[in-house]
UniProtKB/Swiss-Prot annotation:
Gene: E4
Biased segments, Pro residues type: 22-36
Assembly and interaction partners: Assembles into oligomeric complexes. Interacts with host CDK1. Interacts with host SRPK1; this interaction may favor expression of late viral transcripts. Interacts with host cytokeratin components KRT8 and KRT18.
Organism: Human papillomavirus 35
UniProt family annotation: Belongs to the papillomaviridae E4 protein family.
Subcellular location: Host cytoplasm; Host nucleus
Note: The major E4 form is first synthesized as an E1^E4 fusion protein from spliced E1^E4 transcripts, such that the first few amino acids of the E4 protein are derived from the N terminus of E1.
UniProt protein name: Protein E4
GO biological process, one term: symbiont-mediated arrest of host cell cycle during G2/M transition
Length: 93
């Protein structure tokens, strides 16, 4: 120690001379848990077997006029109720 007064003020400094730094051995790492890989889920096309052109399904409302029109990727469904109210539905794909 360079300063004897420091050893009196800080008695723990005396331990530094007897301390020899050692690096503890590293523990052997555990192997990663092994599990069989799950098969990847394949997304099937929801549109398989669906006709490419829209068709009007049979309905109990055949007595009520209604139309189905397509413009690009938009589907327009127009119907009129028995009371005369016109309902328009647009579906953008």
């Amino acid at each position: 120690m360079a300063d004897p007064a420091a050893a009196q003020n800080y008695p723990l400094l005396k331990l530094l001379h007897s301390y020899t730094p050692t690096t503890p051995p590293r523990p052997i790492p555990k192997p990663a848990p092994w599990a069989p890989q799950k098969p990847r889920r394949q997304i099937t096309n929801d549109f398989e077997g669906v006709p490419s052109s829209p068709t009007t399904p049979p309905s109990e409302c055949d007595s009520v006029p209604w139309t189905v029109l397509t413009e690009g990727s938009t589907l327009h469904l127009t119907a009129q109720t028995k009371t005369g109210v016109v309902v328009v539905v647009q579906l953008h794909l």
